[in-house]
Amino acid sequence: MAVENLVVVGSGPAGYTAAIYAARANLDPLLITGFQDGGIPGGQLMTTTHVENYPGFPDGILGPELMDRCRAQAERWGTRLLEADADAIDLSQRPFRIRVDGQQIETHALILATGARANRLDLPGEERYWSRGISACAICDGATPQFREAQLAVVGGGDSACEEAVYLTKYGSPVHLIVRSADLRASAAMADRVRANPAVTIHWDRRVVQASGGDWLEAILLEAPDGGQERLAVKGLFYAIGHTPNTRLVQGQLELDARGYVLTRPGRPETAIEGVFAAGDVADAEWRQGVTAAGSGCQAALAAERWLSHHELAVRVSRDSTEPKPVGETQPTVVSDAANLDPEALWQTGSFALRKLYHDSPRPLLVVYTSPSCGPCHVLKPQLKRVLEELAGQAQGVEIDIEAESEIAQQAGVTGTPTVQLFQARELRQQWRGVRQRSEFRQAIDNLLAVPA
């Protein structure tokens, strides 16, 4: 088995930037984009709307579109992308070993760019109403039919909280912004925007202490510093209260700080283990910006290239750049109808295809519910399509846009995006919320195929 020069684990701004620089240095990097521990391919920018502070985009750019452009640039310079799942990392021997979807990859150098995941409040009632009114991603779940014209709440006082509060006014009103202090931590521009929005009500010096309701969230309880309490009747509660670094894969191997962030040399990407570098939010507890993550990815790649050269480990692969695929000019989605439905197609779109395959096809049917602004949906769909391609026609898939077909989503009990439902013989066999490992979907379908319908 050939040993890789450099493997990058993680595909946010840090991971893609590291890959771009490493590829331009002819290091032939391998970037593992798949479901990272606690994160999603593309990083946190996949769960944002307009990014307005990334240089070069004076009118702003959608987070998922920015990551598409980063991916295209990495591919242009020869980065090899592995859309698989990093399951384990072993730094105890050289070359380092990474287990990916059951196979082992060996590498001389490693850049860890696994990012961070959203924090929870751990409220009484939180587990019961998670995905039934409580969410950590307004951009993913805001279009859920149950939130239409309902009162909603966002917890937090930073840029993300303010952005999500303003974004949610597209769907519900009023939107209550719950801030635990007497001021916002957000940038001045974002703070001014949320204060000026008449559909946003700010509650200062308040904590959410309980969530309650029936089958769906109906209310939250706020508490003031003096112990006074107030009940807010809301159908949705969205968390924007910071993040925890995704470091489980290297716990006990790399030095971490008290909050779990990877410790590196001051101002540099090197970790305590030679040949291992960290970039982006996994090692940044202070700045946590897309542009700083990209900069740290650049640093990590340059440091890795120098380290490999110094130890005479680099095997250079000369490769000219290729023309990048156009990004931002996606083809319009064709919704299946009676005129264009192909009953043998692996992937189709719309409720007509769903009804037809649900009633007529004997094969397992994956139904994925998405929304236009859902970054994780953007990540998940290629993984599901890959599963169906591997199965070579033994299963099929349908995509439903919950904004365009909200009635279908409501009938299906969909409470956020992405949601995936697996059917066979008109029976719901399994359901998932959020991005999961590709192998999990494959195993579920394999289990159905192993048992006669």
Range-by-range predicted roles:
Residues 74-92, 98, 105, 170-266, ...:
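A Rossmann-like FAD-binding core segment of flavoenzymes
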Residues 369, 388, 392-407:
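Thiol-based oxidoreductase modules, predominantly thioredoxin-like and allied folds used
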Residues 4-77, 160-188, 257:
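Beta1-alpha1 glycine-rich phosphate/pyrophosphate-binding loop at the start
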Residues 378-391:
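Typically the conserved alpha-helix immediately C-terminal to a functionally engaged Cys/Sec
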Residues 421-453:
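Non-catalytic, surface beta->alpha helical segment in thiol-disulfide oxidoreductase systems
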Residues 3, 122, 128-146, 240-287, ...:
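FAD-site-proximal beta/loop scaffold in flavoenzymes
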